[in-house]
Amino acid sequence: MIYLHSGLAQTFSPIYFLVAAGILAMFDNSKTFGFEQETESFLQGLPQYEVVHPYRVDAKGHFLSNFVSHRVSRVQRRETQGEPGNPTRVFYQLQHGGHNLHFNLTLNPHLLAPGFLTERRYGGLEGAKIHSQGPSLCHFIGDVWDLATMKGRAAISTCDGLTGLFKLSQEEFFIRPLERSSDESTAPQVHIIYKRHTSPTQSQLVQPISGDHTTNGTCGVKDPAAALERVERQRERWERRQRRKRRIRQRSISREKWVETLVVADSKMVEYHGTKGVESYVLAVMNIVSGLFLDASIGNPINIVVVRLILLEKEEEDLKITHHADNSLSSFCKWQKRLNVKGEEDAVHHDVAVLLTRKDICTAINKPCETLGLSHVAGMCQPHRSCSISEDTGLPLAFTIAHELGHK
């Protein structure tokens, strides 16, 4: 079922309003997966989306259940790897765009470091609540295909329904639930699928390779809608150059890389997504980032490993986050450097720090504008410059983060 929205002048049938109203009411009451605030305005901002009902199947495609949430305990992970029925593998099917899509997903083994910590701060380290990796894992990567024509990659979190990204026929799609899953219900859980470039941030997040390099050695992602076609041409030229470079690089020995990452969500993020939902949301976004860097098209695999997640329940006195992206980045870079453990062998030492904010940031001025992210170019090996700031725009946030990490 596909719904189109093309502005206030669009006319709709009474049936559309009844169905859409039901979906919006359900979405408004769902409080699911950190999307509490993204209700009617989110769906109205989508020019096109499709309502789908994924279901779980076995490896041969036989129906198992409409309950699609799936978590793997650390004990299960250790004891059953390599065995038939291994819970670290999970399979789904759904109808999308006239195709029967099959998902073959495997637990993302490196998204969370073995010593991963979540830290909730209430204005400083004093009184902070720190806990280690939870008892279960629910972030997966793998393949998606249609038996007739297509095959692509997917990065899906299954903590509460299916949330993530998949790519088919050079197009990228987001999937997310519209309602909370229930152990007691046998009915299918309603989800929506929408293209990356029909999301509310279409003009904002043109491509992860776009951005303006400023004289101070930073790179900012902006959203000049009028320049969309120009940036698309730049992207195509860039991809052609990268393909030529990859052909040369592939002659050398492939080297796997690891990037240990600190992720910080500011108080606006926590307020927006909810204290309970923000952790799952942030890790779902980082799972998409991980999937982007594991794509074979970039050459050598790069593992994005989250070693520490800091959730700021209250603002930090020595961390100033404003609309001014440059000043905010400068403050964050100093703040994260003080937090970092010097010894690389330490479990929570990080190579790069990522700040996620709901502030409407802007390069060079302290007022809202189109900037989505900012980072220092080539700063990975410099602790005071290995940091970035990204504005939360929903699941497309993953592409902003990936863009900024790409400049390291």
Where are these regions (language model features)?
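Autoinhibitory propeptides
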Residues: 92, 111, 118, 125-225
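Classical protein tyrosine phosphatase
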Residues: 152-179, 277-299, 407-408
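Active-site recognition of the HExxH zinc-binding catalytic motif
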Residues: 142, 354, 395-408
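Fold-level signature of zinc-dependent metallopeptidase catalytic domains
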Residues: 2-17, 21-114, 184-381, 392-396
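Short, well-ordered junction/capping motifs at the entry into regular secondary structure
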Residues: 386-392
